[in-house]
Design a protein with these regions (language model features):
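Intrinsically disordered, low-complexity proline/glycine-rich segments
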Residues: 2-205
Length: 205
């Protein structure tokens, strides 16, 4: 359990914070959890607190080439708008917050084991471990903002985020939803590549 919890730090709502997160960063100020239902991000995602209360909701437009997504809070107020654009081999997501702040996330430096995304417009950095499905979000002064973890082998695409700078919660939620889409896009590309390789091998035989 200790070894697994070091690399796979996801936890369910109501469970204690991951021991390794606590050891490295202290107790989180707040934790949020996501569930995407019906096997598709386009059906919407609920972001809840430890008690299961829905605090935010994200919904994507059907058949949108730019994967347009809007996030609202529990009262229906607009929180953020996210759009994806593809430049050559790299995806870039543009996020506009309700307060007018604007920033970008790119998968340009994503690799198999260690991923780094510079968040242009904020000066923040998202550092990740794809193998362990964990990501750490740091501010411009290299202080921890949040730790994001994905549940392994979940049909409902579950994430947990431990927040250490609660004043940045809405921005963290926007980054969380964007990351969720980026991970889904990566899975889709890998699946397509595998299918193409299998098809090519069968044809050659």
């Amino acid at each position: 359990m200790g070894v697994m919890s070091k690399y796979m730090r996801f936890r369910e709502a109501g469970e204690a914070a991951n021991v390794n997160n606590v050891a490295e960063y202290g107790e989180p100020a707040r934790s949020l959890f996501t569930t995407s239902k019906f096997f598709s991000l386009h059906k919407g995602t609920d972001i809840t607190d430890d008690a299961g209360n829905v605090l935010y909701h994200s919904a994507s437009k059907f058949f949108s080439i730019h994967d347009k997504t809007d996030i609202t809070d529990q009262d229906g107020n607009h929180v953020a708008h996210i759009e994806r654009k593809v430049f050559t081999l790299h995806e870039r997501h543009f996020i506009t917050m309700a307060d007018g702040r604007y920033f970008e996330l790119s998968n340009e430096l994503w690799h198999l084991i260690k991923d780094i995304s510079n968040i242009e417009g904020l000066g923040w950095v998202l550092r990740g471990n794809i193998a362990g499905l964990n990501f750490q979000l740091y501010d411009q002064d290299d202080r921890i903002i949040a730790v994001i973890s994905q549940k392994l082998f979940s049909i409902h695409d579950k994430y947990c985020v431990d927040i250490y700078q609660p004043e940045e919660e809405k921005t963290v939620v926007a980054i969380l939803v964007t990351l969720q889409h980026m991970m889904k896009d990566r899975e889709a590309r890998n699946s397509s590549s595998s299918s193409f390789s299998s098809s090519s091998s069968s044809s050659s035989n």
